[in-house]
Amino acid sequence: MSLEDLFERSVEALRERGVLFAVAGGFAMDLYRREPRLTMDIDFAILTKTGDVGTATAIVESLGLHAGLAREADLAGGPLFAIRRRSTRPCMIVGRPAENPSGEGVDLLLPTLPWVASALKRAQANNVDFGFGPVPALTIEDAILSKLHALRRLRAKDLDDLQSIFEAQREIDIPFLAGQIHSFAIDIPRQAEPFLPDWLVKLSHAADRSTRGRHKP
């Protein structure tokens, strides 16, 4: 099955189960990047009427993929004790071919990720035709927020997505973005700051100062 076929089948499976969803990840980033990039999987942010983990697992398995669960500590890279004890919340169901764990697949991002719930609501008015009809997709602001949240892992592709989006010089609702950065207390890693716009780094610093101020006795 091609990645495009898997994309369409995934959308059908999500709709059949009445799941609120939006295209995220590489396909969403390509809507706003200066140039497209290669992606090996399809990401959807989701919100279900029942248990998110159970429904997401069933959807992935209905596509003929093996379902794995990623927790907050897994994505953040630690702390090690949290990974071992599985003490942090599930935040993603990872679907990959059982015979090829590094092959093309589907990732379902759960609302335990702080940006997902609000991004899903905004995406319902941002429909994009990926070749098989209109599908909700992350707005440019929420695409940026998703990548800023992922930056703590310091993956090259997350930083590259952000750089390419800003290089494209598309219109961005900066007041909204500033409010969400403050609300989610997004802290840009120092190593990434030189590669991002100064105004964005300043927003992150302001959010960090505000968070520290709230925590003072």
Predicted features, each with a name:
Residues 1-217:
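Compositionally biased terminal segments of proteins
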